[in-house]
Amino acid sequence: MTPDTADRPDATNANHRGAQILGAGAQAPNFSLHSTPDQRVSLEDFRGQAVVLAFYPADWSPVCGDQMALYNQVLPEFRRLGAELIGVSVDGVWCHTAFAGARNLHFPLLADFEPKGAVARSYGAYRDAEGVTERALFVIDGDGVIRWSHLSPIGVNPGADGILEALEGLHQHAGHTTAGAGAPS
């Protein structure tokens, strides 16, 4: 299982290349990216609700395809724990649309396409030399604070165990009140 970085903010935030992603306790940078040619999704749209933010290098690569398919299978558990899932890569919206359709994905894939990698850079999750995002995961609470992050080697599927542990901890800390937390009063 992946270590929980909520207690050890720097435990998994750097890789052998020296890449450094934002750690637990940091404010998650807001963003607004296209999910379709005519629709944008913003982190602010999820205020009051936990978010699993999954940066991945590229649609259609075997590891990314397996990772996103796994998260699609685990999506009901993420939602049971009060979280929504968002995938982000530098691929364009048409590529995402085809990829999501082929994989039957039921969560938004956002295009960090123009300016290329700007959102990934704000999270410390961009690989300049290759022009792709790192394989980086973030669990963000309803107040927009990163509660867990993990940087995986680019060719390794990080799985879902670390995400689930972080969400369970967040869910327990919130006193099991995350469901409906974003509802207007």
What are these model-derived regions, one by one?
Residues 1-185:
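Chalcogenol-based redox active-site neighborhoods
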